[in-house]
Amino acid sequence: MKVFLLSLLCICSLRAEPPFWGTIFIDPDIIKPSDPSAYLSLKDAGQGRRTMYDRRENNWVILTPYLFNATYKDGLKIEVQVNPEFGNADDARKEAEKYSYVIGQLTTALRRDVETVWIHKGTNPFGGGNNNLLIHTGQAVKYINDGILEETFVHEATHTSLDSRHAKKPKWIAAQKADGEFISNYAKDYPNREDLAESYLPYFAIRYRPDRISKSLAKKIKQTIPNRIKYFDSLALDMYPVIKREAPSVNQLFYSEEKQLLTISWNSQVGAKYIIQSSSDFSVWKTVMTYIIADTILT
């Protein structure tokens, strides 16, 4: 009996080991530099006194950064604050434009609470939260070389825009418990702080970029966090610009009186969510609005 119990404990221990150390590293092509961005424009706003966090100091600093107002196609706006150490407004603007575009590749749901961006030199980790995204350009070079700059922004923006809304929600906590495992060591070590951000990128990959990851990777994600995946599905997050906002046109509408079955088909986008807008007047059945997750290009 003791031998059996010991074996059982060993098996459980192996099952509980997370499949990844950190999820920003699982695949560099989940978001590509060529993917669409909601970035629209950048307007100079001079310089002004601001309080910024600098990881090189491990503290808050008061500076007079170069200021830029980034505007996005979904109506969101961000003030980009560039450390004056970059020397002049032109060089600061280059940094602001560079990262404003990449941030625009994030979905509306991830940018909705981002009010400011801090840009410093230095090889220090990025950060999210405080209605902000923190960038150290030396570290950005490393992320770019590894192909994970965009994936890192997804992680950090999840902290900024999703943590406060969901990390302490009873349904999220219930999903964690139901899964019984963590997607990464980082999530396991800091379940309250990092689990949501660590889980969201893999979720995004299987739902919206399934063609860019291996089947084995997708299987591993689905097996490890199935209930967290269901939780994210339930949120109906605004996925623009990954998913276009225009409702697709119905290309077939057929009613079988014999079967009392109404069949509707439309050209869908893989990963998009749809519901049918119900009406007793068939003349208004012209478009499909967003809940059913599309698995093929024809739904």
Question: Model-predicted segments: where are they?
Answer:
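Sec-dependent N-terminal signal peptides
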Residues: V3-C12
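Soluble non-cytosolic domains of exported or imported proteins
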Residues: F86-E97, Y143-I148, T152, A187, ...
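Auxiliary, metal-adjacent structural segments of Zn-dependent hydrolase domains
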Residues: I30-L133
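Sec-exported extracytoplasmic/periplasmic mature domains
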Residues: G104, T108, T158-H166, P202-R209, ...
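Short, composition-biased motifs enriched in small/polar/acidic residues
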Residues: E246-T299
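Boundary at the C-terminal end of the N-terminal hydrophobic targeting segment
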Residues: L14-P18
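Active-site recognition of the HExxH zinc-binding catalytic motif
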Residues: G147-H166, A197
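Metalloprotease/metallohydrolase-associated module, dominated by Zn2+-dependent proteases
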Residues: A174-A247
